[in-house]
Amino acid sequence: MELSEITRSTLVSTLSRLLRRHKESNPDFFLIRSKMFIGGLSWDTSKKDLTEYLSRFGEVLDCTIKTDPVTGRSRGFGFVLFKDAVSVDKVLETKEHKLDGKLIDPKRAKALQGKEPPKKVFVGGLSPETTEEQIKQYFGGFGEIENIELPMDTKTNERRGFCFVTYTDEEPVQKLLESRFHQIGTGKCEIKAAQPKEVYRQQQQKQQKGGRGGTRGRGRGQGYSNYYDQNYGGYGNNDSYGDQGYGGYDYSGYNYGNYGYNQGYTDYSGQQSTYGKARGGGNHQNNYQPY
């Protein structure tokens, strides 16, 4: 049965209205459909090179190539955000993609199930001399702060060598995580996404499944809003990429090792062992070894 012009027009109008409402109430659903992970990049491929190549499939709104925070070298992968989700389909329909003489590996971005974008960051290597006002001033430049936690040593009643900063939304966290180290006051601090204690325990259980001694040291770090500085050094493990400024994108099924993504950075599991001593005989900086 053929629809009349009036019926067809009404149907199109109704569907457009419903789609618009769905977009307004589920913005992340449409954002993730337009985002891609690009692996296997040449060390020489620049952001401009990648943008120009992918622009043939549609308008590119944003493009990022991740670099080593210490050496500044490309880590061989990046992310791209298209204006329209159909551009992602076009990229995937093409069997091979070659850029700068190397086959690249584009994949559709996948949001982690049940994982909210991080709004809280862990700040390690914080000098005890850095004032709360300096911390507020620096981090306030990235967005609206909801809360700052400055843990105290219960024995000495002095500030610990780390803190937590919570924002009202996730955008400031993503901006902060674009750089691993930040100059705050007189010292260089390390910024990492904070994870709730239950997330940390779930990750630990996965890693220690079938092994012994999985509960050892679990009491460490409790009392700081139930957050741990867990596994922040590992870039090749399950959910790690969601904590590096990409708001919870899941690439756990991807063999990152082929691209050298596991940089072997220090694992700060148990904040007391790394940032724990506030002054400790004046040797605070020696307790912080990120390199």
Curated annotation (Swiss-Prot):
Residues 196-226 are annotated as: Disordered. Its main location: nucleus. One of its GO terms (cellular component) is chromatin. Residues 34-116, 119-196 form the RRM domain. GO terms for molecular function: DNA binding; poly(A) binding; poly(G) binding; RNA binding. One of its GO terms (biological process) is regulation of gene expression. Keywords: Cytoplasm, DNA-binding, Methylation, Nucleus, Repeat, RNA-binding, Transcription, Transcription regulation. Acts as a transcriptional regulator. Binds DNA and RNA. It comes from the Eukaryota. It comes from Xenopus laevis (African clawed frog). Transmembrane segments: none annotated. Pfam families: RRM_1. This is Heterogeneous nuclear ribonucleoprotein D-like-B. It is found in: Nucleus; Cytoplasm. InterPro entries: hnRPDL_RRM1, Nucleotide-bd_a/b_plait_sf, RBD_domain_sf, RRM_dom. Gene3D superfamilies: 3.30.70.330. Residues 210-222 have a biased composition (Gly residues).
